[in-house]
Amino acid sequence: MFNLMANCCNWLKRWREPARKVTLVMVGLDNAGKTATVRGIQGESPLDVAPTVGFSKVDLKQGKFEVTIFDLGGGKRIRGIWKNYYSESYGVVFVVDSSDVQRIQETRDTMAEVLRHPRIAGKPVLVLANKQDQDGAMAEADIIETLSLEKLVNENKCLCQIEPCSAVLGYGKKVDKSIKNGLNWLLNNIAKDYEAISERVQKDTAEQKAQEEQDKKERAERVRRIREERDRQEREEAEREGRTLKEEELDDVNMFNPFQPINNVLTENQDRLNREKEMQRQRENGQQGSVQEQIALQDEEEEEEDEESERQTPESTESGAVDQTKKKTRKLRLKRKHRVDPLRMEEAAPKSPTPPPLPVGWATPKVSRLPKLEPLGDTRHSDFYGKPLPPVAIRQRPNSDTHDVIS
């Protein structure tokens, strides 16, 4: 009775515990089946999977765990980024292509490099011997012997479990049982030492962030030194040639961090374009104002000439007839102030008149129509039915008797 009550209390305690967050990294050579395995666990079809470029992140719920799996690409050029994910991982899933015997040595070297990393050593490792459904696939014992798996895990003090499986045989609830059993084993071992592993993950993550900040500062310092050396060389070369060098004032922030966010760059470009447009508008307004001033001056000069011509005309004292004949006729002029000035200089340029559109059917060849065909002979007898038929000419025919003629 006492044991039953203790078991019930333990069950209630576990049931009330919050879900634990666990991060796993899935690594292995390219074409080993990592993405197919993740999709099968997630409940998606593992068929027609494209190679992973970089990494992909998958979140899923597994029992009392909220699992985040980082599926890392296995190409040679991408394996260098694996170490950036080791610090926040609670465990490792290493996928092996058991049917690719030619690359088994490369698999061994890669696995040894992963397990010997200081941020992976001591963490539980699950090895999935994938593609067991293909012909020529290596057995579990052969893989352990070829990879020297027992030696590697003992040297790095890692708990290890190997599961032969095939990721393409099912997904979701029908996923390969070996994959499901291996994942449960990995999560259970993490749960047994969750506090220690979580503390180690937090410590490694903080150290990695500090290291990244230090590397960032060192890169910025190297860039600054390179710029200073280049400016010094340009200044010395300008002094030797006897020319002055215009030094640009650089922002302290840009000197400290040469890599600026794209939003800042876009904002600066937009401001520069706005300034250029404003300067262009001011230049156009200045040109238009100068043209208007010239037109006003010309109008004033013409008015003064007209007034002088009127004053210089002598007053006539002769008779009205002579005055009318000698009166000076004023020449009509079109003053500039009566003209309509264009708003812009571009519109003032005369435009060549566009020819009107050609009429419909222009240049269409004329069709020479044939005359109407008429029947041969004269069929138009208007008085044919109004007159009697002409008499038939009687021709003499011989009778049976000689020289007898019927009249």
Swiss-Prot record:
The UniProt keyword set, sorted, is: Cell membrane, Cell projection, Cilium, Coiled coil, Developmental protein, GTP-binding, Lipoprotein, Membrane, Nucleotide-binding, Palmitate
Compositionally biased spans, kind Polar residues: 285-295
Basic residues bias locations: 327-339
**Span list, region Disordered:** 202-407
Deletion consequences: Embryos have a ventrally curved tail, ciliary defects and cystic kidneys.
Q: Which GO terms describe its biological process?
A: cilium assembly; formation of radial glial scaffolds; interneuron migration from the subpallium to the cortex; neural tube patterning; non-motile cilium assembly; photoreceptor cell outer segment organization; receptor localization to non-motile cilium; smoothened signaling pathway
**Classification via PROSITE patterns:** ARF
Q: Where in the cell is it found?
A: Cell projection, Cilium membrane
Expressing tissues = Cilium-specific.
A cellular-component GO term for this protein: non-motile cilium
Q: Where is the lipid attached (S-palmitoyl cysteine)?
A: C8, C9
What happens on changing T35N? Abolishes ability to rescue a arl13b mutant when transfected, without affecting localization to cilium
> Where are stretches of biased composition, namely Acidic residues?
298-309
Q: What is its main location?
A: membrane
Q: Which residues form a coiled coil?
A: 195-313
Binding of GTP: at which residues? 28-35, 71-75, 130-133
Ranges of compositional bias, category Basic and acidic residues: 202-247, 269-284, 340-349, 371-384, 398-407
Q: How does it sit in the membrane?
A: Lipid-anchor
Q: Which InterPro entries match?
A: Ciliary_GTPase (IPR051995), P-loop_NTPase (IPR027417), Small_GTP-bd (IPR005225), Small_GTPase_ARF/SAR (IPR006689)
Q: What does this protein do?
A: Cilium-specific protein required to control the microtubule-based, ciliary axoneme structure. May act by maintaining the association between IFT subcomplexes A and B. Binds GTP but is not able to hydrolyze it; the GTPase activity remains unclear. Required to pattern the neural tube. Involved in cerebral cortex development: required for the initial formation of a polarized radial glial scaffold, the first step in the construction of the cerebral cortex, by regulating ciliary signaling.
The entry's family comment says: Belongs to the small GTPase superfamily. Arf family.
Q: How does it assemble?
A: Interacts with EXOC2; regulates ARL13B localization to the cilium membrane.
The name on file for this protein is ADP-ribosylation factor-like protein 13B
Q: Which gene encodes it?
A: arl13b
